[in-house]
């Protein structure tokens, strides 16, 4: 997905949040935002993909600010709340595959870029459980998972990965496939890293691998050899969240299923769904 007109202000707003989280020094904040403006002028162009352009800008800001993980407190709070809510859900609900898919999508609400507060998670989950998927290819996903030999599950945000675990557990119940679970090489906004996935125990559910990059989504020209091998041999690829949609949506590959909440107008418009819609969509480009 190429940048839309809203992406510029979204990136600028995220830069401001990063700066405010990283330092209280007003002069450093001012100079950091001047740098951000220069970086935006460089990276925001008609061929840019939002997730990639934003990541390159954010990582340069991290260097300037001397803070390699300004979202650490937000991520820890998200992790704590998500673990509790996921445990409650597993005790209260009778989970089948389709509900597990829905929960994995609902978990995608945990996102700093849209101003989500982790304290609201339980209430948001209860509310969204009543919603139907606007695009629902979960039956196709179920059939593909059943016959797959290799499955690649690409995670998105910290906290959300506890909801991913619910779906991966269901996948393992219906499939004997080798499951690869991918996280980021290092911190970028509130995305889940390999370290986050391992700390949450996802190694028990599959082989945890790194994308080989800190860029949001999975720009295939920048990923590791290990990730590319898992990607190439996968019979099913489950890609969580908007960043993965932005970087993979133009690839002509029907193995990919996008699971996300359309949290911004640009992504919603690209998907042809209302903002806020829950989506389980097989890649629209067919092999």
Curated annotation (Swiss-Prot):
Its EC number is 3.1.3.-. Signal peptide: none annotated. Activity is strongly promoted by Co(2+), Ni(2+), Mg(2+), Mn(2+), Ca(2+), Zn(2+) and Cu(2+). Activity is inhibited by EDTA. A motif (Subfamily I KC motif) lies at residues 263-264. Mn(2+) binds at residues 156-157, 191. A motif (Subfamily I GNFE motif) lies at residues 243-246. InterPro entries: ARMT-1-like_metal-bd_sf (IPR036075), ARMT1-like_metal-bd (IPR002791), DCN_phosphatase_I (IPR053636), PH1575-like (IPR014444). Keywords: Hydrolase, Manganese, Metal-binding, Nickel. Gene3D superfamilies: Uncharacterised protein PF01937, DUF89, domain 1, Uncharacterised protein PF01937, DUF89, domain 2, Uncharacterised protein PF01937, DUF89, domain 3. Changing residue 10 to A: Does not affect catalytic activity, but abolishes absorption at 300-500 nm. Its cofactor is Mn(2+); Ni(2+); [2Fe-2S] cluster. GO terms for molecular function: hydrolase activity; metal ion binding. Changing residue 263 to A: Abolishes catalytic activity. A motif (Subfamily I CxxC motif) lies at residues 7-10. Changing residue 111 to A: Abolishes catalytic activity. Changing residue 108 to A: Abolishes catalytic activity. It holds the Pfam family ARMT1-like_dom. Phosphatase activity is strongly promoted by several divalent cation ions but it is suggested that Mn(2+) and possibly Ni(2+) represent biologically relevant metal ion cofactors for damage-control phosphatase activity. It is an enzyme of class 3 (hydrolase). Belongs to the damage-control phosphatase family. Nucleotides phosphatase I subfamily. Metal-dependent phosphatase with probable damage-control functions. Shows phosphatase activity against p-nitrophenyl phosphate (pNPP), but natural substrates have not been identified yet. Low phosphatase activity against 8-oxo nucleotides suggests that it could hydrolyze oxidatively damaged purine nucleotides or their biosynthetic intermediates. Subfamily I proteins are distinguished by three conserved motifs: the CxxC motif localized near the N-terminus, the GNFE motif localized about 40 residues from the C-terminus, and the KC motif localized about 25 residues from the C-terminus. In the crystal structures of the subfamily I proteins, the side chains of the cysteines in the CxxC and KC motifs face each other across the rim of the putative substrate-binding cleft, and the GNFE motif lies deep in the cleft close to the metal-binding aspartate and asparagine. This is Damage-control phosphatase PH1575. It comes from Pyrococcus horikoshii (strain ATCC 700860 / DSM 12428 / JCM 9974 / NBRC 100139 / OT-3).
